[in-house]
Amino acid sequence: MPDFPPNSLPADVARAKSPEEFHGGLRRALAGFDELGARIVADAAVKLACCEGCSLCCWLRVDVHAHEVFLIAQHVRARFTETELAALIARLAVHSAKVLPLTPYEHVTQNIACPLLQDGRCSIYAVRPHSCRRHHSLDFAACQFTYDHPTDLEAPAAHDRDLFKTLTEAMLGAAETYARLGYDDTIYELGTALAEALDTPSSWRRWRDGKRAFLRASVTPAA
């Protein structure tokens, strides 16, 4: 079973100076996270209901840390055309207008599409955050029920317990690596944080200086 967080992550983050070095360390960590999940699925013969083209989970609130948001921001700036980037920024503005007036609880009881969802697919799949990579289902019908009844927060999750537990521990371990090195450990909502990252270059400098990265984004209280 591969180690997670990868043994190199603390050193990668500690020695990073440029955005590219920070993002490189996180990319390697995300690859290790995927390897960990795939190994568990293979070893335990977990039968996932997830399939290409299904986007029911892309209407859920997505919690992220600032380092994940900055990787996504770098990715869209580098990979999207000017037209695609402008369209994304417009969708992020609409998304923020919907989400910012809501409490996190109000948000999770509504279906609000991720602004990064395009034609039923994730437009930043290669750099999607840990919480999206952790999410999985054993039962499509359970996902459909959650989508159809967003206010029913008592419906049992259709996760594989061992897989979800292990990936949650790994996700928290990665976040703790950044926190121990003095970086912002606030839990943000993805769309509102990405909107600010793209709109406000100083957010990167604040984060790099150990301050709170995003001042307007929706925040999820720590458990």
PLM feature spans:
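Short loop/turn segments that flank or connect secondary-structure elements
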Residues: 1-223
